[in-house]
Amino acid sequence: TMWIGFGVIALWNIFKEKLNLNTNVAAIGALLLVLTAPLIMGFQNWDDHDRGSHQGSRDYAINFLESCEENAIIFTHGDNDTYPLWYAQEVEGIRTDIRVINVSLLGVDWYVNQLRYKMNDAAHLKLTFTPNMIKGNIRDYVPYVNNPSIDKNKYYNAKDIMKFISKDDPKIKAQTRYPYYVPTRKMSFPVSAEAVKTMNMTDAPDSLIVSDMRVDLRKASLQKNDLMTIDIIANNINDRPIYFAISVAPSAYLGFQKYFQQEGLTYRIVPVENVSGQPTQS
C-alpha cells in the first residue's frame, strides 16, 4: 500500500510537470493507471480465490454432527474443529439437539457458565461447580497432592472427587499449601445398566460391559478445562451420549480412550474396556 501511494505521487508529478496537465487531471490519470494493477489481479485471480463452491469444511462439520446420537454432547478442540459445527447448527439448523463443547474454552468461566443453560434444542448440562467456584482464575490450577488417608489402589467416584475439589475449606490450605487439590489419580465413572440400554451405548455382550469406567489420570495437576471435562462426563454420562471428535488431541482424552468406540467421525465413551487401547468399531 505504501509503494502504491508513492507511485501515485510520482505519476501525478510526471503528468503535472512533463505533460503540463492541471492538478485534477494529473491526479485522476495517475489514479487510473495505478488501479489497473489490482483490477487485472482481480480479473485474473478471481476464479482461483472464489470460495463460493468450497463446502469441505461445512460437509466435515455435518459429518461430525450426524455421527452423534440424539441429545448428545461432543467435545471438540480449537476453532477449526468448533466453528464449522456451530455454523451448521446456527445457520443451517442441522442437529441443534447436540451440545458442542470446545475443550479449549472450558478454562474460561463465562464459557462454562453458558453450558448451564439450554441452547437451541440442546438441554443444559449438569455441573458440580457453581459460577463462583470457577470465577476468574479460581481453580485454574488444581494439583495432585498425595493424601496418606487415600487408598492408592482404590478407584473413587469422580462425582465425589469433584465435590471434594469444590470445597473451600481453610483446613485444606493449612495442610497442603493449596486451597484445593486432587486427592487421587484413580477415578471411577459408574454407568447404570438402564442407561446402557436406553441410550443404546454398545452392542457388546453383557459380559464385556462394565458398571464402572475406571480412569487413571497421568497428570500431576488438572487445569480448569481438564476439571470441567471430568465434571461434565461424571454428571452426564448416564443421561446423554458423550463423544470426542476424532480430531481432538489425545492429551484431552484424560484416560478415557480405553473406553472409546468409534462412530463415524467421533469416539463415543461406552462402558466397554478396550484391552488393546484402540477404539472399538460400532
Report residues per predicted region.
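ER/secretory pathway lumenal C-terminal domains and tails of membrane proteins involved
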Residues: 1-71, 86-282
